[in-house]
Every structure is written in structure tokens, then in C-alpha cells.
Amino acid sequence: MSTWKSSLFLDSSSFLLEQLRFFHDHALLILNMITGAVAYIMISLLFNKYNHRFLLEGHTVETIWTILPAFTLIFIALPSLKLIYLIDEIRNPLVTLKTIGHQWYWTYEYSDFKKLEFDSYMLSYDNLNPFNFRLLEVDNRTILPYLSNIRLLTSSADVIHSWTIPSSGVKIDASPGRLNQMSFTLNRTGIFYGQCSEICGANHSFMPISIESISPSNFIKWVNKSSL
């Protein structure tokens, strides 16, 4: 999550967010070029001394401003389509994490392992230590291995929720009676925070998400310890 003195994007914790940032820069560059060209044309038209009172048509100009926007949209659409298919693609996941939203906490199930399921509640102010983030810390963190393809399944037991980790570029709705899925890969170790991003009731602001990314070997040790 964004913290103090932060006005830019978060440091990427997944390959997906890196691609989304590249696309953002690509689209922003094109938009800046369009804005500059339009501003230059408007200023030059306003401050020059040329006029044509009887100008009724200009086929050349109309052809130019029809073809150029078409090519511009193509240059924006192609990377966008690539990202859409990249987000939806599920390829040989090593870990499947099922997330169930409740009012107002999360339940996590590791479908690849037996007896590995827990609830995750926000820590109250009295239980925080000086190094915790207020409204973002939970009693049970979600443990995931880095450099591993992770399949995320989401659903809800009551109303619509949204499971979101901004630094990983992950945002997926958790709808009652429906199972949604997406995949992502964490590219480094660390602790990454998120929150429910769909207004789900009075305590919507108090159902945070906390992911702890660790090495695959330590993940296996944690699974063996938690499954006992």
C-alpha cells in the first residue's frame, strides 16, 4: 500500500505489475505527444495572421486526422491486448491459493495441501507493535513462495469483496456463488499489504490483506509445520 511521502508507483513485487507499469509509460508517452501536438496547432492557429473566410472543405486534412488516430489506437491496443491475455493465462501453477471473503475478514485455503486453512483478521490497535502498520496488519499472514507461478481463486460467503495487492498488480473480485481466478508470480521476498477494494459494509475498511513472500524451501517447511 502507499505510505507516507509516496507519490509514484509502489516498488513492483511481481512480474505482472512490471508489465502494467511499462504499458502505463507507453500510453502516457503517446498521450503527451498528442497533447503537445494539439496544443501547438491551437496556439499557432490563434496567433497567426492567416485567414480563409470561405474554407468549406479540406480532404487532405480530413484524411490525415482520420488515419493518424487509427494508428495511434493500434499502438495503444496491441500492448493492452497482450496484457489482458497475460493476466488471464493460467500456466502450470505450483501453488493454488483459495480466498473467501467474509464480513469482515478473509479465509485462506491451500488446495494443494491437506488441513491447511485459516482465517485472517485485522489486528486491533492494542495488539500492534511499534513496527506494524495501522489497519494493515493481520493475525495470520498469507505465506507464498516467490519465483513460483501462483493461481489465485476467489469467492465470497456473503457480499461482493475485492482481493487486492497493489504492489503485485493483483485485483480480483470475490463474488458470492462465483469462483474467479487469476495468476501472478512474486519476484522477491518481503511483506506486501492490500485491502478489500469493494465497499462491502460498515467495516469495509477493516479487512486488510498481508502477504509474506518467502523462498520455496522455507515455504515447504512452513507447510509441513502448519499441516501438523
Curated annotation (Swiss-Prot):
Which keywords does the record carry? Copper, Electron transport, Magnesium, Membrane, Metal-binding, Mitochondrion, Mitochondrion inner membrane, Respiratory chain, Translocase, Transmembrane, Transmembrane helix, Transport
Q: What class of enzyme is it?
A: translocase
Which locations, inside or outside the cell, does it occupy?
Mitochondrion inner membrane
Q: Which residues bind Mg(2+)?
A: 198
Report the gene name. Answer: COII
Q: What does this protein do?
A: Component of the cytochrome c oxidase, the last enzyme in the mitochondrial electron transport chain which drives oxidative phosphorylation. The respiratory chain contains 3 multisubunit complexes succinate dehydrogenase (complex II, CII), ubiquinol-cytochrome c oxidoreductase (cytochrome b-c1 complex, complex III, CIII) and cytochrome c oxidase (complex IV, CIV), that cooperate to transfer electrons derived from NADH and succinate to molecular oxygen, creating an electrochemical gradient over the inner membrane that drives transmembrane transport and the ATP synthase.
List the Mitochondrial matrix topological domains: 49-62
Query: Transmembrane ranges?
Result: 27-48, 63-82
Principal cellular location given in the protein's record: mitochondrion
Protein's membrane topology: Multi-pass membrane protein
Say which domain of life the source belongs to.
Answer: Eukaryota
Residues on the Mitochondrial intermembrane side?
1-26, 83-228
EC id: 7.1.1.9
Catalysis: reaction(s): 4 Fe(II)-[cytochrome c] + O2 + 8 H(+)(in) = 4 Fe(III)-[cytochrome c] + 2 H2O + 4 H(+)(out)
**Name of the protein described by the UniProt record:** Cytochrome c oxidase subunit 2
> Some GO term, biological process aspect, for this entry: which one?
ATP synthesis coupled electron transport
